[in-house]
Amino acid sequence: MAKVCYFTGRKTVSGNNRSHAMNQTKRTVKPNLQKVTILVDGKPKKVWASARALKSGKVERI
């Protein structure tokens, strides 16, 4: 299972670190994903959910 939010689709994105000399190195920015159990078709299923989805009430936990 990929680390992608089941509800919002948030996933890891890439960017750059910049030094004072403006040198660049690649970096990744990861979302705050939590593993939660939800009901899908009446059965419990463990999925990744972003903290934003949890706080906004998009997730109905069991």
From Swiss-Prot:
The keyword Acetylation does not apply. GO terms for biological process: translation. GO terms for cellular component: ribonucleoprotein complex; ribosome. SUPFAM superfamilies: L28p-like. It holds the Pfam family Ribosomal_L28. Belongs to the bacterial ribosomal protein bL28 family. PANTHER family: 50S RIBOSOMAL PROTEIN L28, LARGE RIBOSOMAL SUBUNIT PROTEIN BL28A. This is Large ribosomal subunit protein bL28. It comes from Streptococcus pyogenes serotype M1.
